[in-house]
A protein has these predicted regions:
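Bacterial N-terminal signal peptides that target proteins for export
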Residues: 1-10
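Bacterial Sec-dependent N-terminal signal peptides
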Residues: 2, 17-57
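Bacterial N-terminal signal peptides
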Residues: 9-19
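Short, ordered, surface-exposed loop/turn motifs in non-cytosolic proteins
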Residues: 69-70, 75-91, 162-164
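Edge beta-strands of extracellular beta-sandwich domains
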Residues: 120-130, 214-225
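Proline-enriched interdomain boundary motifs that mark the N-terminal boundary
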Residues: 133-141
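Short helix-loop boundary/capping segments
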Residues: 140-193
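Beta-strand-rich modules
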Residues: 195-220
Length: 252
Protein backbone atom coordinates (compact mmCIF):
# COMPACT_ATOMS: atom_id res chain seq x y z
CA UNK A 1 0.00 0.00 0.00
CA UNK A 2 2.84 2.40 0.86
CA UNK A 3 4.55 1.78 -2.47
CA UNK A 4 1.29 2.28 -4.34
CA UNK A 5 0.65 5.56 -2.51
CA UNK A 6 4.19 6.75 -3.18
CA UNK A 7 3.89 5.94 -6.87
CA UNK A 8 0.62 7.90 -7.10
CA UNK A 9 2.30 10.89 -5.45
CA UNK A 10 5.18 10.63 -7.89
CA UNK A 11 2.87 10.68 -10.89
CA UNK A 12 1.05 13.68 -9.44
CA UNK A 13 4.37 15.48 -9.03
CA UNK A 14 5.14 14.99 -12.73
CA UNK A 15 2.14 17.13 -13.61
CA UNK A 16 3.69 20.16 -11.95
CA UNK A 17 7.32 19.82 -13.07
CA UNK A 18 7.39 20.49 -16.76
CA UNK A 19 11.00 21.63 -16.91
CA UNK A 20 12.33 19.44 -14.18
CA UNK A 21 13.16 15.97 -15.03
CA UNK A 22 15.43 16.87 -13.28
CA UNK A 23 24.11 15.58 -9.47
CA UNK A 24 27.12 16.38 -8.28
CA UNK A 25 27.99 15.27 -4.74
CA UNK A 26 28.89 18.15 -2.49
CA UNK A 27 31.38 18.13 0.39
CA UNK A 28 29.29 19.40 3.28
CA UNK A 29 32.30 19.89 5.53
CA UNK A 30 33.79 22.38 3.06
CA UNK A 31 30.44 24.08 2.65
CA UNK A 32 30.10 24.59 6.38
CA UNK A 33 33.59 26.06 6.61
CA UNK A 34 33.39 28.46 3.67
CA UNK A 35 29.67 29.22 3.40
CA UNK A 36 27.18 28.07 0.77
CA UNK A 37 28.25 28.01 -2.85
CA UNK A 38 25.55 29.97 -4.67
CA UNK A 39 27.16 29.78 -8.09
CA UNK A 40 28.87 27.15 -10.19
CA UNK A 41 27.75 24.40 -12.49
CA UNK A 42 27.00 20.72 -12.46
CA UNK A 43 29.77 18.50 -13.81
CA UNK A 44 29.48 18.41 -17.59
CA UNK A 45 30.31 15.45 -19.82
CA UNK A 46 30.64 15.15 -23.58
CA UNK A 47 28.18 12.47 -24.80
CA UNK A 48 29.60 9.20 -26.05
CA UNK A 49 26.38 7.83 -27.58
CA UNK A 50 23.17 8.95 -29.30
CA UNK A 51 20.88 8.73 -26.26
CA UNK A 52 19.25 11.48 -24.23
CA UNK A 53 18.40 10.80 -20.58
CA UNK A 54 16.37 13.03 -18.28
CA UNK A 55 16.62 11.46 -14.84
CA UNK A 56 15.60 12.55 -11.39
CA UNK A 57 15.33 11.04 -7.95
CA UNK A 58 12.30 12.54 -6.21
CA UNK A 59 11.97 12.78 -2.45
CA UNK A 60 8.41 12.47 -1.16
CA UNK A 61 7.26 13.06 2.41
CA UNK A 62 4.57 10.52 3.34
CA UNK A 63 4.36 11.75 6.92
CA UNK A 64 6.22 8.78 8.41
CA UNK A 65 9.38 10.73 9.16
CA UNK A 66 12.06 11.53 6.60
CA UNK A 67 11.78 11.34 2.83
CA UNK A 68 10.84 8.32 0.74
CA UNK A 69 12.23 8.13 -2.79
CA UNK A 70 11.00 7.58 -6.33
CA UNK A 71 12.86 7.49 -9.62
CA UNK A 72 11.63 9.18 -12.80
CA UNK A 73 13.63 8.58 -15.98
CA UNK A 74 12.90 9.44 -19.61
CA UNK A 75 15.12 7.93 -22.32
CA UNK A 76 15.20 8.73 -26.02
CA UNK A 77 17.55 7.79 -28.85
CA UNK A 78 17.75 10.10 -31.84
CA UNK A 79 14.42 11.56 -30.74
CA UNK A 80 12.58 8.24 -30.39
CA UNK A 81 11.41 6.89 -26.99
CA UNK A 82 13.30 3.93 -25.54
CA UNK A 83 11.03 1.65 -23.50
CA UNK A 84 13.12 -1.52 -23.22
CA UNK A 85 16.18 -0.31 -21.30
CA UNK A 86 17.34 -1.74 -17.98
CA UNK A 87 17.26 1.13 -15.49
CA UNK A 88 18.84 0.55 -12.08
CA UNK A 89 19.11 2.88 -9.10
CA UNK A 90 21.44 1.22 -6.61
CA UNK A 91 19.93 -2.29 -6.36
CA UNK A 92 16.41 -1.32 -7.48
CA UNK A 93 15.06 -1.85 -11.00
CA UNK A 94 12.99 1.07 -12.28
CA UNK A 95 10.21 -0.23 -14.52
CA UNK A 96 8.79 1.40 -17.63
CA UNK A 97 5.31 2.90 -17.16
CA UNK A 98 3.35 5.45 -19.17
CA UNK A 99 5.91 7.57 -21.05
CA UNK A 100 8.93 6.85 -18.86
CA UNK A 101 10.51 4.74 -16.16
CA UNK A 102 8.84 5.44 -12.80
CA UNK A 103 8.86 3.50 -9.56
CA UNK A 104 9.60 3.71 -5.86
CA UNK A 105 13.16 2.96 -4.80
CA UNK A 106 14.89 2.22 -1.52
CA UNK A 107 15.91 5.25 0.51
CA UNK A 108 19.65 5.90 0.50
CA UNK A 109 22.22 8.63 1.07
CA UNK A 110 23.46 8.31 -2.50
CA UNK A 111 21.52 7.15 -5.56
CA UNK A 112 23.67 5.53 -8.25
CA UNK A 113 21.99 5.35 -11.67
CA UNK A 114 23.00 2.77 -14.27
CA UNK A 115 21.16 2.38 -17.57
CA UNK A 116 21.78 -0.42 -20.06
CA UNK A 117 20.28 -0.88 -23.52
CA UNK A 118 20.92 -3.46 -26.21
CA UNK A 119 23.57 -5.06 -24.02
CA UNK A 120 25.55 -1.87 -23.43
CA UNK A 121 25.79 0.51 -20.48
CA UNK A 122 24.61 3.84 -21.89
CA UNK A 123 24.43 6.04 -18.78
CA UNK A 124 25.90 6.30 -15.29
CA UNK A 125 25.70 8.93 -12.58
CA UNK A 126 24.86 9.60 -8.96
CA UNK A 127 22.38 11.87 -7.19
CA UNK A 128 21.53 13.01 -3.69
CA UNK A 129 18.22 14.30 -2.36
CA UNK A 130 17.75 17.71 -0.74
CA UNK A 131 17.35 17.45 3.03
CA UNK A 132 13.64 18.35 3.00
CA UNK A 133 10.79 19.73 0.92
CA UNK A 134 10.31 23.49 0.42
CA UNK A 135 7.17 24.96 1.98
CA UNK A 136 5.37 27.90 0.36
CA UNK A 137 4.84 30.35 3.23
CA UNK A 138 2.86 33.29 1.85
CA UNK A 139 0.13 31.49 -0.10
CA UNK A 140 -2.60 29.00 0.76
CA UNK A 141 -4.81 26.93 -1.52
CA UNK A 142 -7.98 28.91 -2.12
CA UNK A 143 -6.26 32.30 -2.19
CA UNK A 144 -7.60 34.72 -4.80
CA UNK A 145 -5.31 36.51 -7.23
CA UNK A 146 -5.98 39.18 -9.86
CA UNK A 147 -5.72 38.50 -13.58
CA UNK A 148 -2.54 39.90 -15.22
CA UNK A 149 -1.03 40.82 -11.83
CA UNK A 150 2.40 39.72 -10.63
CA UNK A 151 2.40 37.02 -7.95
CA UNK A 152 5.05 36.85 -5.22
CA UNK A 153 5.91 33.33 -4.07
CA UNK A 154 7.88 32.87 -0.83
CA UNK A 155 9.16 29.61 0.62
CA UNK A 156 11.16 28.08 3.45
CA UNK A 157 14.88 27.51 3.12
CA UNK A 158 16.03 23.99 2.20
CA UNK A 159 19.56 22.69 2.75
CA UNK A 160 21.44 20.22 0.60
CA UNK A 161 20.51 21.90 -2.69
CA UNK A 162 22.12 23.75 -5.59
CA UNK A 163 19.11 25.70 -6.92
CA UNK A 164 15.36 26.32 -6.76
CA UNK A 165 12.72 26.55 -9.49
CA UNK A 166 9.19 27.99 -9.35
CA UNK A 167 6.35 26.79 -11.58
CA UNK A 168 2.80 27.85 -12.35
CA UNK A 169 0.42 25.65 -14.33
CA UNK A 170 -3.02 25.98 -15.85
CA UNK A 171 -3.83 23.51 -18.62
CA UNK A 172 -1.23 24.30 -21.28
CA UNK A 173 -0.37 27.68 -19.81
CA UNK A 174 2.87 26.96 -17.99
CA UNK A 175 5.42 29.22 -16.36
CA UNK A 176 8.79 27.88 -15.25
CA UNK A 177 11.36 30.16 -13.69
CA UNK A 178 15.03 30.01 -14.46
CA UNK A 179 17.13 28.10 -11.95
CA UNK A 180 17.31 30.30 -8.84
CA UNK A 181 20.26 30.48 -6.41
CA UNK A 182 20.18 28.37 -3.27
CA UNK A 183 19.97 31.48 -1.07
CA UNK A 184 16.72 32.59 -2.76
CA UNK A 185 13.53 32.37 -0.70
CA UNK A 186 11.16 34.29 -2.99
CA UNK A 187 10.35 34.79 -6.65
CA UNK A 188 7.81 36.89 -8.54
CA UNK A 189 5.81 35.25 -11.34
CA UNK A 190 5.05 37.94 -13.97
CA UNK A 191 1.41 38.88 -14.41
CA UNK A 192 1.43 37.91 -18.08
CA UNK A 193 1.38 34.28 -16.94
CA UNK A 194 -2.04 34.80 -15.32
CA UNK A 195 -4.02 35.80 -18.43
CA UNK A 196 -7.24 33.93 -17.61
CA UNK A 197 -9.69 35.09 -14.92
CA UNK A 198 -13.21 33.95 -13.98
CA UNK A 199 -11.91 31.84 -11.10
CA UNK A 200 -9.32 29.96 -13.13
CA UNK A 201 -7.24 27.69 -10.89
CA UNK A 202 -3.46 27.92 -11.20
CA UNK A 203 -1.16 25.44 -9.46
CA UNK A 204 1.90 27.02 -7.87
CA UNK A 205 4.87 24.90 -6.82
CA UNK A 206 8.51 25.27 -5.74
CA UNK A 207 11.17 22.70 -6.65
CA UNK A 208 14.33 22.25 -4.56
CA UNK A 209 17.09 20.78 -6.72
CA UNK A 210 20.39 19.10 -5.94
CA UNK A 211 22.53 18.87 -9.05
CA UNK A 212 21.82 21.79 -11.37
CA UNK A 213 23.02 25.32 -10.59
CA UNK A 214 21.62 28.69 -11.74
CA UNK A 215 24.10 28.63 -14.64
CA UNK A 216 22.77 25.27 -15.87
CA UNK A 217 19.48 26.31 -17.49
CA UNK A 218 20.72 24.91 -20.81
CA UNK A 219 20.07 21.46 -19.36
CA UNK A 220 16.39 21.94 -20.24
CA UNK A 221 16.89 23.00 -23.86
CA UNK A 222 15.71 20.71 -26.63
CA UNK A 223 19.04 21.16 -28.40
CA UNK A 224 21.05 20.09 -25.36
CA UNK A 225 24.43 18.68 -26.41
CA UNK A 226 26.10 17.67 -23.12
CA UNK A 227 25.41 15.58 -20.03
CA UNK A 228 24.95 17.28 -16.67
CA UNK A 229 26.09 14.96 -13.86
CA UNK A 230 25.44 11.99 -16.14
CA UNK A 231 28.04 10.16 -18.26
CA UNK A 232 27.29 8.58 -21.63
CA UNK A 233 24.23 10.40 -22.99
CA UNK A 234 23.28 14.02 -23.19
CA UNK A 235 20.77 15.02 -20.52
CA UNK A 236 20.89 15.37 -16.75
CA UNK A 237 20.52 13.61 -13.41
CA UNK A 238 19.29 15.43 -10.29
CA UNK A 239 17.83 14.96 -6.85
CA UNK A 240 14.58 16.83 -6.26
CA UNK A 241 11.97 17.66 -3.67
CA UNK A 242 8.81 19.67 -4.31
CA UNK A 243 6.50 21.80 -2.24
CA UNK A 244 2.85 20.92 -1.91
CA UNK A 245 1.05 22.41 -4.90
CA UNK A 246 -0.88 25.57 -3.95
CA UNK A 247 -4.07 26.26 -5.92
CA UNK A 248 -4.65 29.96 -6.52
CA UNK A 249 -7.93 31.25 -7.99
CA UNK A 250 -7.48 34.04 -10.53
CA UNK A 251 -10.32 36.52 -11.04
CA UNK A 252 -10.76 39.49 -13.37
Amino acid sequence: MIKKTLFILLMASLMFSVQISFIGCEDNSVEEASGPNISGSAEQFTPTNDYKVQARVVGVNLGFGGLSACADVVITKEGEPVNDALVMVNEDTVLYSYSGYNSTISTNDNYVLTISHDGNVIATGSAQLPDSEPVITNLDSGDVHTKDADLLVEWSDVSGITSYQVTSNYDYNTYTSSLLPLNATSHTIPGEYFPTGDGTVYDIQVNAINGLYPDDDNAFNDDLTIGYDIEGPKGYLIGLTQSTSIQVYVND
